[in-house]
Regions:
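Formylglycine-dependent sulfatase
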Residues: 2-7, 13, 19-479, 485-519
Length: 519
């Protein structure tokens, strides 16, 4: 069976399923089903294939300048929030669920990579990070700025349209032109790729810098003196030892939350803005604040999810207080899937939480659990409320979609946004006769490629990392899965589908060699 014969499986499957869910069933709304707790993680996938893709009220006019807020959570698995099937007895996410109730929830949203830096690069530029010098893993704490200052980003595009722009939260895309010297001005940096304001954790939660960045300098830097032995991080390792106020892990999320909300409160109606807010939860170390500690039966990891939800609520409250909600598009998602590593995660799973929902694998891996993430879009009156969609999309599509959203033509495919597809019609709930994305390439922490097209997922199985971890050896060989019938990637069907393998392998090579995948 060829790819062409299966290309439209999603739409065909939706049509078949919508004809007769099951004999004797009494139809109920998705909202009522969620209220009754009828959808687990796998059930939500099924529900979205039963026709919950409603038409949008209206299309934005070219040149509209709505405010835009992107909330990119960290390591949040598909099944970690209520509107994606998390058990409400273990975790409650009323603010994220509010976004889903007031907006549109996607069940097949994917990150470009199953780790942090590459996804953040792809989100802002519309280009897969494996096209750069970073072929596996993430940027280290001293890495130079990874986005070329000449490369268009969402922020630089919007800034040219008169938007005020800010990044608050985890940056993890490097500073300066060579090895970062945190005692000096951190330029080039976010300001050189379109952001007017920055308040950031330089790399990761619990990273070796131990500090915040505000503007172009370490916040509160007193001198250029370094004392590496003075401070230890959560792993017991020496910090860089910067002579500046040190972050307290339990206070990082409240600090970022307040900075994001405060920046929003400074905005004035009629002057468009773009906030890229990247909270550090639910990345390790698991450090809920005093306000959420002990709030979840799933333990500290559940508390950490609550911390994220509380932060989302503060952002939404700031928009409400300023009367900006109706004029603001909010996109909530995650940089990759959840992570199994850690005592707190293990305790949460032992309690019954399923952070990756029905998917195999987690962060770092080539399996679906590494890429499938929550993805919710809200824009009152434009994005249809309380709807869901199973269109295959990528976070890399954010650039092209926002460009269409504000009426800006994309640059030539060889110049920018090389891997970004316009999925605005999916955001708006408009009917589509064929998939918006004919294919999608994903990439693991070890540099393993996979390509999806229709129901098929082809894993090339060749790690770029010189010494990949033995624990992930089952990813390091070619394999083919039919996700339409095997969402858990349990049965390799390459031997019975040689034509599909040949087509997908050729597609992957073509997209790599020509320098772009956008069509």
């Amino acid at each position: 069976m060829s790819i062409e014969q299966n290309r439209d499986f999603r739409l065909q499957g939706s049509r078949r399923a919508s004809q007769a869910p099951y004999e004797g069933a009494t139809p109920i709304s998705r909202r009522e089903a969620m209220r009754r707790g009828l959808f687990g993680a796998a059930g939500l996938l099924l529900a979205d294939r039963l026709g919950f893709c409603a038409p949008a009220p209206s299309q934005p006019a070219a040149g509209d300048k709505p405010n835009i807020v992107i909330i990119l959570s960290d390591d949040l698995g598909w099944g970690s929030v209520g509107c994606y099937g998390a058990d409400p007895k273990l975790v409650r996410t009323p603010n994220i669920d509010r976004l889903a109730r007031e907006g549109r929830r996607f069940t097949d949203a994917n990150t470009a990579s199953s780790v942090c830096s590459p996804t953040r690069y792809a989100l802002l530029t519309g280009r897969c990070c494996w096209r750069t010098s970073l072929k596996y893993e993430v940027l280290n704490v001293n890495a130079p700025l990874h986005i070329e200052p000449t490369r268009p980003t969402i922020a630089s595009m919007l800034k040219q349209l008169g938007y005020r722009t800010a990044v608050v939260g985890k940056w993890h895309l490097g500073y300066q032109s060579e090895k970062t010297d945190y005692t000096q001005p951190l330029r080039p940096g976010p300001q050189d790729v379109g952001f007017d304001y920055q308040f950031a954790v330089p790399s990761n939660h619990g990273d070796a810098t131990g500090v915040f960045i505000e503007g172009e300098r370490v916040a509160g830097l007193r001198s250029a003196t370094l004392n590496p032995a003075k401070y230890k991080n959560w792993r017991g390792r020496n910090q860089i030892g910067l002579d500046a106020p040190q972050r307290v892990d339990e206070d990082v999320m409240p600090t970022l939350t307040e900075k994001a909300a405060a920046w929003l409160r400074q905005q004035e109606p009629g002057k468009p803005f773009f906030l890229y807010y990247a909270p550090v939860s639910v990345h390790n170390p698991i450090t809920p604040s005093a306000k959420t500690k002990g709030s979840s039966p799933a333990g500290a990891y559940g508390d950490w999810i609550h911390e994220l939800d509380r932060s989302v609520g503060a952002v939404l409250a700031a928009l409400d207080e300023k009367g900006l909600a109706k004029d603001t598009l909010v996109l909530f998602t995650s940089d990759n899937g959840g992570e199994f590593f850690g005592e707190e995660q293990a305790a949460a799973q032992a309690a019954g939480l399923k952070p990756m929902g029905p998917f195999k694998g987690d962060k770092h891996t080539i399996w679906e659990g590494g890429f499938r993430v929550p993805y919710i879009v809200r824009w009152p009156g434009r994005v249809p409320a309380d709807t869901a969609c199973d269109e295959m999309i990528s976070l890399t599509d954010t650039f092209a979609t926002i460009a269409a959203f504000v009426g800006v033509p994309l640059p030539p495919v060889k110049d920018a946004a090389e891997d970004s597809f316009n999925v605005l019609s999916a955001w708006l709930g408009q009917e589509r006769k064929s998939p918006l994305r004919p294919h999608m390439i994903v990439h693991s922490a070890d540099g393993v490629f996979a390509v999806r097209r229709g129901p098929w997922k082809w894993i090339e199985g060749k790690p770029a990392k010189p010494k990949p971890p033995e624990a992930r050896r089952d990813e390091f060989h070619p394999q083919l899965y039919h996700l339409g019938s095997d969402i858990g990637e349990a049965v390799d069907v390459q031997d019975s589908n040689p034509a599909v393998v040949a087509e997908l392998n050729a597609l992957l090579n073509r997209c790599r060699e020509r320098g772009y995948s956008r069509e």
